[in-house]
């Protein structure tokens, strides 16, 4: 999920041994069946002899057939099997492990740092759990999203899958705070770069020539995995996507303990702006969107207060040990600058919200619903609809005006331009950097 500069701040191991085990079970079953057939023949012969000599012998009892053992559970299509059932020992796949650069090399071998890393196991398993949810949901989405589908259909399909795989439907009070959607599924099209998800009644349909940013979060116990990718259906945009993917990977490579944010931004911009893209006979330089940033993530808080720029200059703040960051970059064929535009859908309660006396009963009631169901996690209007709330806009706007709720309008470059996004969540462990959301797809 994007942070705006101007605002306040492996794989499932389901094959391998299982396949071999299933072959052994099948062979055992076949052998058992053959034994049963031989027993039946002997029984018939014995029955004939018994007719002549009397019932001197007892009939052999038929051996019960061995039941086939069920293999390890597999993910369904669409994804609905909770990830915890696929990993019953609660040990989830690691992300990509990268050693620190240069002066931080000692961290990989330092005994004290290794001890601290082991102490963080629960924290890491919650993040890895959420990351595996994200990977499985997005890989299904990438295969099944097609032009002609409505944005509502796409968003709800992703969100339903995340809720199923985390095991949290979010319909009971407090359930979504334990796990589920880390923030609403963003589906920002073409010149719109971020923070767009359909509100109720939206009829927008994905078109063949669209460039769609898919940005969603999955969380376990408030450990939000924030990762995004861009989908296109025309190879003309390939260079735009390549530029942004390269820029994001550059940012990930440069990130580390004690690294200055400004240095990361400079490296990202250099990588991004080395590309150009030709669309309809016109060549466009790919520009980094200078007022969009990555950000650190805290428990139940998607924008933790630190920003990771994607252009040079500015913030001299350093990354610190134990922090979690969303490294995200945005490229554009337009001005490389976004403004608020279109109807707002994303909202979140401010973590240090002021204590304000609310006059509107609708605002008081709505705040109570938000506190119990989302806390400081971002939500959208569709989520309020899903909880049975209605006629809430007046109260919602009142909460925004009071500074209790922050609204996040869609962020757009100039019309006619195209924007792309890639994003990963990284954990700055004491010994190594873990790209928690890395997958085979990006």
Swiss-Prot record:
Its cofactor is Co(2+); Zn(2+); Mn(2+); Fe(2+). GO terms for biological process: proteolysis. One of its GO terms (molecular function) is initiator methionyl aminopeptidase activity. Residues 30-47 have a biased composition (Acidic residues). Residues 56-72 have a biased composition (Basic residues). It is found in: Cytoplasm. Its EC number is 3.4.11.18. CDD domains: MetAP2 (cd01088). It comes from the Eukaryota. A divalent metal cation 1 binds at residues 215, 226, 423. Binds 2 divalent metal cations per subunit. Has a high-affinity and a low affinity metal-binding site. The true nature of the physiological cofactor is under debate. The enzyme is active with cobalt, zinc, manganese or divalent iron ions. Most likely, methionine aminopeptidases function as mononuclear Fe(2+)-metalloproteases under physiological conditions, and the catalytically relevant metal-binding site has been assigned to the histidine-containing high-affinity site. Its main location: cytoplasm. Keywords: Aminopeptidase, Cytoplasm, Hydrolase, Metal-binding, Protease. One of its GO terms (cellular component) is cytoplasm. Belongs to the peptidase M24A family. Methionine aminopeptidase eukaryotic type 2 subfamily. This is Methionine aminopeptidase 2-1.
């Amino acid at each position: 999920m994007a942070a705006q500069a101007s605002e306040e701040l492996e794989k499932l191991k389901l094959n391998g041994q299982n396949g071999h085990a299933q072959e052994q079970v099948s062979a055992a079953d076949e052998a058992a069946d053959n034994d049963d057939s031989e027993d039946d023949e002997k029984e018939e012969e014995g029955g004939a002899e018994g007719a002549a000599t009397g019932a001197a012998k007892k009939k052999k009892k038929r051996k019960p057939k061995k039941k086939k053992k069920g293999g390890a559970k597999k993910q369904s299509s669409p994804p609905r099997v909770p990830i915890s059932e696929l990993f019953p020992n609660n040990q989830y796949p690691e992300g990509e492990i990268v050693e620190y650069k240069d002066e931080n090399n000692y961290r990989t071998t330092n005994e004290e740092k290794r001890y601290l890393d082991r102490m963080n196991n629960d924290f890491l398993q919650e993040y890895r759990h959420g990351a595996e949810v994200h990977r499985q949901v997005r890989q299904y989405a990438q295969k099944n999203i097609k032009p002609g589908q409505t944005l509502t259909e796409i968003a709800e399909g992703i969100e339903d899958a995340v809720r199923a795989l985390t095991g949290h439907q979010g319909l009971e009070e407090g359930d979504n705070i334990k796990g589920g959607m880390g923030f609403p599924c963003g589906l920002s099209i073409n010149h719109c770069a971020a923070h767009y998800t359909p509100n109720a009644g939206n009829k927008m349909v994905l078109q063949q020539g669209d460039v769609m940013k898919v940005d969603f979060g999955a969380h376990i116990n408030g450990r939000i995995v924030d990762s995004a990718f861009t989908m296109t259906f025309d190879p003309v945009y390939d260079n735009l996507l390549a530029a942004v993917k390269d820029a994001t990977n550059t940012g990930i490579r440069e990130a580390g303990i004690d690294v200055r944010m400004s240095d990361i931004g400079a490296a990202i911009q250099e990588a991004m702006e080395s590309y150009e893209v030709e669309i309809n006979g016109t060549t466009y330089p790919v520009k980094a969107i200078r007022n969009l940033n990555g950000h650190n993530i805290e428990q139940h808080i998607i924008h933790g207060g630190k920003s990771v720029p994607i252009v040079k200059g500015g913030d001299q703040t350093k990354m610190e040990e134990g922090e979690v960051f969303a490294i995200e970059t945005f490229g554009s064929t337009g001005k490389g600058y976004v403004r608020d535009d279109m109807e707002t859908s994303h909202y979140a309660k401010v973590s240090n919200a002021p204590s304000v006396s609310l006059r509107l009963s609708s605002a008081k009631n709505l705040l109570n619903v938000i506190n119990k169901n989302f806390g400081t996690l971002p939500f959208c209007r569709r989520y309020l609809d899903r909880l049975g709330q209605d006629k809430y806009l007046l109260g919602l706007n009142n909460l925004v005006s009071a500074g209790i709720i922050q609204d996040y309008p869609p962020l757009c470059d100039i019309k006619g331009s195209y924007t792309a996004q890639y994003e990963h969540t990284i954990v700055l462990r004491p010994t190594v950097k873990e790209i928690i959301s890395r997958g085979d797809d990006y």
